[in-house]
């Protein structure tokens, strides 16, 4: 039996003239496109041919007189695949009554999209989660290093999120909108419903859902900023990825935050800092003296690094596995500690953090920034 009361996570909104105009604009554009520019939409509405150059915003509407359907209005707001499922499950209502896509709609009608309860799809295991953001549709946490996002064979972040949902009465599946490698830290975004997943995935596909990273790479990156566009695919060994003409195109933009020319040998002796100009900008240089005759110094661990390192801010436009790691390795600047892609061993995880995400709130239209 369908429920009659609203829950906090349901979607409620009242149809406005703007919603009607959005449908008319869409119809107007489609008609012009399908008729090689001949404006049959305007003429079918009784608008004289002398006014056929008017914009769709000039078209008048009078609520029901426009003959606008619920399906047409929702189609301007939500992915069609999600709408089909919501209508099949009878979760969409007009003025409190179950609705179909063909139902007529007018200004001031109330639309109610009920969010169905779901069974949690991962074993709930308590974890110390660092929650960065939460609303009715999204849940964003700061993933620590050394934890996988989702794994059937071992404890993963999905188990911790499932426990949080259960503990807070959130009867939802765990839907990850992004993934991070085990050693990558920072923003992990989880959708609380299929509709939210579809809407925010659409933003990711359109690159209006921004994903920003901080990385430390080997060597002095000369360009202040650049866009790395390479085709990538999984290598023959099945372990890592590589730039390959047969792969899918990826885009990784970056800007250099700072550059360091460093000689790091042993932190225990005669360390001092200085500032030098290496031709790009003034950077910190760290010099270390060491007793080369000391048998306790591991010369393989404390290898002299003439190249230094750079800290970069990265924006990811595509979401290929290991994309940032592959891109910087390909240009000769692997992430510090990323031995899989050619970096010197440091004994520490590679330096990559999902620093922030920026997106448009699916209910309010507000731009939201979440920083880890």
Where are these regions (language model features)?
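RNA pseudouridine synthases
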Residues: 1-372
């Amino acid at each position: 039996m369908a429920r009659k009361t609203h829950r906090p996570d349901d979607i409620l909104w009242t149809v406005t003239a703007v919603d009607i105009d959005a449908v008319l604009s869409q119809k107007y554009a489609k008609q012009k496109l399908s008729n090689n520019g001949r404006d049959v939409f305007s003429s079918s509405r009784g608008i004289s041919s002398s006014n056929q150059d008017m914009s769709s915003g000039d078209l008048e509407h009078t609520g029901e007189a426009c003959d606008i359907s619920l399906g047409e209005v929702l189609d301007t707001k939500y992915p069609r695949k999600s709408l089909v499922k919501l209508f099949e499950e009878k979760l969409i209502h007009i003025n409190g009554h179950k609705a179909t896509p063909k139902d007529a709609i007018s200004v001031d009608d109330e639309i109610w999209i009920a969010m169905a309860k779901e069974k949690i799809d991962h074993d709930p295991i308590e974890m110390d989660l660092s929650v960065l953001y939460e609303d009715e549709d999204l849940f964003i946490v700061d993933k620590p290093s050394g934890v996988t996002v989702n794994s059937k064979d071992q404890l993963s972040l999905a188990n911790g999120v499932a426990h949080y949902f259960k503990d807070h009465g959130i009867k939802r599946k765990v839907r990850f909108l992004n993934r991070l490698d085990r050693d990558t830290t920072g923003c992990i975004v989880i959708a609380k419903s299929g509709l939210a997943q579809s809407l925010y995935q659409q933003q990711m596909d359109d690159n209006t859902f921004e994903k920003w990273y901080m990385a430390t790479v080997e060597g002095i990156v000369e360009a202040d900023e650049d866009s790395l566009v390479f085709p990538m695919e999984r290598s023959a060994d099945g372990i890592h990825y590589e730039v390959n003409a047969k792969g899918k195109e990826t885009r990784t933009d970056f800007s250099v935050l700072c550059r360091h020319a460093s000689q790091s040998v042993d932190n225990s002796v005669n360390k001092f800092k200085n500032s030098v100009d290496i031709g790009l900008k003034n950077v910190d240089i760290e010099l270390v003296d060491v007793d080369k005759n000391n048998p306790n110094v591991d010369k393989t661990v404390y290898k002299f690094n003439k190249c230094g390192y750079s800290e970069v801010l990265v924006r990811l436009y595509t979401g290929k596995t290991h994309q940032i790691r592959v891109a910087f390795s390909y240009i000769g600047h692997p992430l510090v500690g990323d031995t899989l892609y050619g970096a010197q061993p440091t004994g520490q995880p590679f330096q990559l953090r999902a620093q922030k995400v920026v997106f448009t709130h699916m209910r309010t239209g507000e731009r939201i920034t979440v920083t880890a």
